[in-house]
């Protein structure tokens, strides 16, 4: 895999607060190599290590995108939800930003069935068929569409398992991470000082609570994906 320059700037990362970890009492000792100091009761993340792993992740997603691979971005906590949707839409990736439904990947047949139902209902809505139904029946179907849009809207165009999954918060999205591990789907994961760096294929040490931190990391990854997609289009 070719290494590229992704304009990852330490000062920019500091401004985004990427270096602020959790309180020193809430930490995973496995994170010791990624921590540079303690300050006012919190661990400070070593941004040089962050830059290195973020660069590796950008190389990986660029390479995958340049070969037409598909990505899923997962981040369901309120602070991350909007950034996840914006990043995914920009890079034409699938995303989950409301709630991870257990078995979404490991029980793909059920997920696929729900997606087919969702697509059929949306088609009926667009063609005006719902307007011809009795009010009560139409109301039931509209509620179903709304429910499916909330939980499956970000993956409505997904036709198979993703090739790479990007996870914004390891602890919040532990079920999603475990499903990826079970299916051997490569993962890129933001890890704060209370996380286990050994679970993901590429772990990026970073503050997973600050919106600015999440957004910066996602923006770098999305830029690399977009560059890879452009390369794929040029060469196909």
Swiss-Prot record:
PROSITE patterns: RIBOSOMAL_S2_2 (PS00963). The lineage of its organism: Eukaryota, Viridiplantae, Streptophyta, Embryophyta, Tracheophyta. PANTHER family: 30S RIBOSOMAL PROTEIN S2 PROKARYOTIC AND ORGANELLAR, SMALL RIBOSOMAL SUBUNIT PROTEIN US2M. It is found in: Plastid, Chloroplast. One of its GO terms (cellular component) is mitochondrial small ribosomal subunit. This is Small ribosomal subunit protein uS2c. It comes from Morus indica. Pfam families: Ribosomal_S2. One of its GO terms (molecular function) is structural constituent of ribosome. Keywords: Chloroplast, Plastid, Ribonucleoprotein, Ribosomal protein.
């Amino acid at each position: 895999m070719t290494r590229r320059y992704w304009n990852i700037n330490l000062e920019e990362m500091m401004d985004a607060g990427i270096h602020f970890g959790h309180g020193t009492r809430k930490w995973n000792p496995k994170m010791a190599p990624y921590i540079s100091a303690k300050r006012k009761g919190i661990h400070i993340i070593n941004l040089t290590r962050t830059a290195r792993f973020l660069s590796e992740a950008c190389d990986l997603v660029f390479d995958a995108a340049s070969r037409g691979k598909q990505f899923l971005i997962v981040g369901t906590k309120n602070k991350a939800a909007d950034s996840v949707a914006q990043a995914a839409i920009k890079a034409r990736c699938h995303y989950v930003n409301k709630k991870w439904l257990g078995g979404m990947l490991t029980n793909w047949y059920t997920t696929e069935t729900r997606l087919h139902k969702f697509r059929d209902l949306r088609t009926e809505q667009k063609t005006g068929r719902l307007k011809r139904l009795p009010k009560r029946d139409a109301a039931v179907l509209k509620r179903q569409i709304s429910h499916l849009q909330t939980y499956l809207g970000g993956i409505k165009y997904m036709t198979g398992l993703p090739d790479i999954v990007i996870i914004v918060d390891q602890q919040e999205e532990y079920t999603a991470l475990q499903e990826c591990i079970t299916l051997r789907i490569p993962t890129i994961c933001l890890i704060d000082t209370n996380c286990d760096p050994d679970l993901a294929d590429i772990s990026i040490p970073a503050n997973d609570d600050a919106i600015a931190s999440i957004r910066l990391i996602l923006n770098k990854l999305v830029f690399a994906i977009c560059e890879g997609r452009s390369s794929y289009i040029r060469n196909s």
